[in-house]
Curated annotation (Swiss-Prot):
Residue ranges the record marks as coiled coil: none
Keywords, ordered alphabetically: Cell inner membrane, Cell membrane, Cellulose biosynthesis, Membrane, Transmembrane, Transmembrane helix
Gene knockout outcome: When the bcsEFG operon is disrupted in a cellulose-synthesizing strain (a strain K12 / W3110 derivative called AR3110 with a restored, functional bcsQ gene), cellulose is no longer made.
Protein's organism: Escherichia coli (strain K12)
The protein, known as: Cellulose biosynthesis protein BcsG
Cell membrane in keyword set: yes
Topology class, membrane: Multi-pass membrane protein
Domain of life: Bacteria
Sequence intervals crossing the membrane: 34-54, 68-88, 113-133, 138-158
Gene: bcsG
Lineage: Bacteria, Pseudomonadati, Pseudomonadota, Gammaproteobacteria, Enterobacterales
Note: Cellulose production is abolished in E.coli K12 / MG1655 and W3110 due to a premature stop codon in bcsQ.
């Protein structure tokens, strides 16, 4: 009888060590809710392993309590890993820059992460869990959902749920001088200027496509002449590189109908800035004469043919460098010189009026004053050919008026900048000077934010940040363009700007009786939308955006 009692007691003694997930149920329920709303880059297997660690039976209650203490930092790290927030590598790489932010700006950034609707929903979920857990074993449902999510992703990354045999849409475009046929470039099919997108969007296929893209881009460059023709007409090139301006920002600010946009001769409607940070953006623009390179290669020496302003210097254009700020934050001026090949002295900033203070407290100069100084300086040049790079940041997040800690209203700043630029255009027209002005934003300001990033955060170069308005205007022409701007809809990037400059190098566009605008703007290089920062890559594949963080799996960008 005694032996029988011991045998039946053994199973019950094992069951008593299965204590369930307890409070960790709420942790997983919150994750499921955020996942359902599209706010997480959820990793099913890691979460299942974490749940198994929490469920593993331990005979001693002290060990059970110790496990909970150990699980706290693990759970926090896993939650962070499941979000779209910047990873440790990004935070470390940007640490010195974050340290330069003013206290008021840091507080402003932190408050943007507070979503009261989300907090309210989590509170309701907490009450529901506390109520239902009195009668229902929530752990069973949590484990079942985790298992289901893992089954869904056995064949690929999270949310890559396309069947292997599903038909896909092939993106076929023609650009540059390419024919509308598939050609072989490094063993990969290429349609026009861009690698073909025929394979299903799995992680392996997207990685292969990205490698093919960079291999194809490495073979592209603008062809500058060795010298200008004897009858070439001198003119000036002014490239205005404005920070924090995208089509999404303009729409959010309600300035799509500003008259400035109707005054350009040429307008790029589908231009990709390829990054969401200032330093890399400036380097890409200054290296516009070669195809797009990876973020890492931006900080490696490039072929001499890649530097747009250096190419112009060889043809007799005098270089000028202007900034609407001091260029010190993040070593911006140093990057422009070392990686962008811009060796010209910074134009004198003495006595320029300060209209704003940056997020780090540095001065932001009045654009009208800077542009007027450019007019004065270049007018005194002995050389009538010049190429000027002007970087300005009146729209940067965190800019505020002197004596005021609150970030200045974006719409008011954008309205002022557009008005000033429009007035400058009028002044240039009156001057009679032959000038080609190219307005190229660095990147957008993330004015609206999305499910991955709050307003102002640009760690991930999303399409709404990198789709920027680019405009070209010619002044001093004998036969100026009439009517609405010529709109270029094809996917473009910096190589198209370089090619456009090459097409007008002889300056005859300013003296011709009739300008063939169609010939000037047709067949410019197309570039597939690929954007990259140090820890994030975003591509457009089969008309859908995909993102890869820290070299992990590709997932669809949350819409």
């Amino acid at each position: 009888m005694t032996q029988f009692t011991q045998n039946t007691a053994m199973p019950s003694s094992l069951w008593q060590y299965w204590r369930g997930l307890s409070g960790w149920n709420f942790y997983f329920l919150v994750k499921f809710g955020l996942l359902w709303a599209g706010y997480l880059n959820f990793h099913p297997l890691l979460n299942l392993v974490f749940a198994a660690f929490l469920l593993m039976p331990l005979p001693r209650y002290s060990l059970h309590r110790l496990r909970h203490w150990i699980a706290l930092p693990i759970g926090f790290a896993l939650f962070w890993h499941d979000t779209w927030l910047p990873g440790p590598e990004s935070i470390m790489s940007q640490g010195s820059q974050v340290a330069g932010f003013s206290t008021d700006y840091l507080i402003d950034l932190v408050t943007r992460f507070i979503n009261w609707q989300m907090i309210g929903a989590i509170f309701v979920l907490l009450v529901a869990w506390l109520f239902l857990s009195q009668w229902i074993r929530i752990t069973v449902f949590v484990v079942a959902i985790l298992l289901w999510l893992n089954v869904l992703t056995l064949a690929g990354p999270s949310f890559s749920l396309w069947p292997a045999g599903q038909p896909t849409t092939t993106v076929t475009t023609t650009g540059g001088n390419a024919a509308a046929t598939v050609a072989a470039t490094g063993g990969a099919p290429v349609v026009g200027d861009m690698p073909a997108q025929t394979a299903p969007p799995t992680t392996a296929n997207l990685n292969a496509w990205l490698n093919n893209f960079y291999n194809a881009e490495a073979k592209r460059k603008s062809t500058f002449p060795s010298s200008l023709p004897a009858d070439a007409q001198p003119f000036e090139l002014l490239v205005i590189n404005i920070c924090s301006l995208s089509w999404s920002d303009i729409e959010a600010a309600g300035l799509m109908s500003h008259p400035l946009w109707s005054h350009f001769d040429i307008e790029f409607k589908n231009f990709n800035s390829a990054t969401s940070y200032s330093g890399p953006a400036a380097i890409r623009l200054l290296r516009a004469s070669c195809g797009q390179t990876s973020h890492t290669n931006l900080y490696q020496p490039a072929n001499n043919d890649c530097y747009l302003f250096d190419n112009l210097s060889k043809l007799g254009f005098t270089q000028h460098l202007m900034m609407g700020h001091n260029g010190q934050f993040g070593g911006f001026l140093k990057e422009v010189r070392e990686n962008g090949g811009m060796q010209s002295e910074l134009m004198d900033q003495t006595n320029l009026p300060v209209i704003l203070l940056g997020f780090d407290g540095s001065p932001v100069y009045d654009d009208t004053a800077v542009l007027n100084r450019w007019l004065d300086v270049t007018e005194k040049d002995k050389n009538s050919r010049s190429a000027t790079f002007y970087n300005t940041l009146p729209l940067h997040d965190g800019n505020h008026y002197p004596g005021v800690s609150k970030t200045a209203d974006y719409k008011a700043r954008a309205q002022k900048f557009f008005d000033e630029l429009d007035a400058f255009f009028t002044e240039l027209e009156k001057s009679g000077r032959k000038v080609m002005v190219v307005v190229v934003p660095e990147h957008g300001g993330a004015l609206k934010g999305d499910r991955m990033q709050v307003s102002g955060l640009r760690d991930i170069p999303s399409p709404s940040i990198t789709d920027v308005p680019v405009g070209v205007k010619f002044f001093g022409m004998k036969a100026p363009h009439q009517g609405a701007p010529i709109v270029i809809e094809q996917p473009s990037s910096f190589l198209a700007i370089s090619d456009l400059v090459v097409r007008v190098l002889d300056g005859k566009i300013f003296t011709e009786d009739n300008v063939d605008w169609k010939k000037l703007t047709s067949g410019l290089p197309q570039t597939a939308p690929v954007s990259e920062n140090s820890n994030a890559v975003v591509i457009q594949y089969q008309d859908k955006p995909y993102v890869r963080l820290n070299g992990g799996d590709w997932v669809p960008y949350p819409q």
